Regions:
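Short, basic/aromatic recognition patches
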Residues: 26-47
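Active-site-adjacent structural patch at catalytic or cofactor/ligand-binding sites
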Residues: 77, 87-98, 106-115
Length: 142
């Protein structure tokens, strides 16, 4: 075994750029077509892995979502994801298919800023109505 670590900064930078370089010569979809395909994929699913974190603490939580008005919406009664959300609104979520072989996996990663909506506010209640979730059911989670 070598005294020199394999994972040098150069090796890690090359790994981080792998897909950009591999896909550089591929034909790209028009922006409107790409957006339509992305939204269709998002709407065809309802569960994601939501990553939150702060400092050395990270958490990745499977959670149900809905998508409308260009935003992901999630209801949660609590959990460790709020440790990160309390100090850092930056999040990442991943939606993906069951693995059926190399080159056949479909998925999507989204990075953005989480916004906590106050329970039973007008926006909260509107989303509950959109999801057809009775407020009485959500009150039991509080």
């Amino acid at each position: 075994m070598s005294d020199t670590p394999y994972y040098t900064d150069q090796v890690l930078r090359a790994a981080a750029c792998y897909w950009e370089e591999k896909d550089a010569d591929n034909v790209k979809l028009e922006k409107a077509e790409l957006q339509a395909r992305i939204e269709a994929y998002i709407l065809a699913n309802n569960t994601c892995a939501l990553a939150t974190g702060t400092g050395d603490y990270v958490r990745c939580t499977p959670i149900e979502y809905s998508y409308h008005d260009g935003c992901f919406w999630m209801f949660s009664e609590g959990g460790k994801k709020f440790v990160g959300l309390a100090k850092n609104p930056q999040v990442c979520l991943a939606i993906y298919d069951t693995y059926e072989g190399f080159g056949k996996l479909h998925g999507l990663q989204v990075m953005g800023r989480a916004e906590l909506v106050e329970p039973f506010s007008e926006r909260y209640n509107a989303h509950a109505a959109f999801q057809k979730i009775p407020l009485s059911a959500l009150q039991k989670l509080s």
